[in-house]
Amino acid sequence: MTDASYLSPAKINLFLHITSKRADGYHNLQTLFQLLDFCDEIRFSLRDDGQINRIKGNEDIVAEDDLLIKSARALKKYSNSSLGVDISIDKKIPAGGGLGGGSSNAATVLLALNELWQLNLDRQTLADIGLTLGADVPVFVFGRSAWAQGIGEILEPINLPQYYYLVVSINKHISTAEIFSHKALTMTPVQRKIADFSRLSDLHNDCLDAAISLQNEIKQALKHLDSTANHLDNARMTGTGCCVFVAFEKEKDALVAKKQLPEQWFGFVAQAINTSPA
């Protein structure tokens, strides 16, 4: 039996512009994915009987719906590997907060089992498999902070400043489907180029108004972060919510701000990274 452990990082969207709605119901977007050094840890024990089992995970999700299992089964189906695996996860990334935890977990499973099952598939193939599981999976498969277009799968790696981020969860959840079907969802139809975002200050998240209308506490969290000392820019929401974040140049300032959070919220400080540890 082979045992191995892999990290699965969180991400934030430094901005998220919805450019159009597609005929298939998905939305085209432009965004900057920033990876963080705040990670789940996933452990793998290989099996020679072909079975895929979840030993430890989110008990609120049945195993068949868990991206840990779905990604392993998708890879097994594609590769026809005779091997199996037992999977366990130690979760740190808040679920359903726009931090990409589930997508990151799926990507880490694909990357890990590609190695452990000795499949030798390239990352583009793994990303194509990942895209069938979720639009954010490919960015974690390629493992780079990136400028993204399409539904999030057209990626251009980019090196971003390695700031420290205070990320706050209000411990509430909004489904992505609720956001994208909400009447308050805004759009930014003008296509921008990646160079524009080095000089424009109008970075925003088109999902914010819809999210606030569903969970007004997001607005309170943004206001609180904007009141902290020594932060670099306006606080923003990541993904479709509900987590919000603000950047600091110095870790100590982020840690001071974390101590000032209301006790009903969960917060963590993480540094931006441009390459995934997965």
Region spans (language model):
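ATP-dependent small-molecule kinase catalytic core of the GHMP/sugar-kinase superfamily
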Residues: 2-8, 13-31, 119-234, 247-278
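Short, basic/glycine-rich phosphate-binding loops at helix/coil junctions
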Residues: 48-61, 109, 131, 196-204
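Conserved glycine-rich beta-strand-loop-beta hairpin in the small C-terminal domain of fold type I
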Residues: 241-244
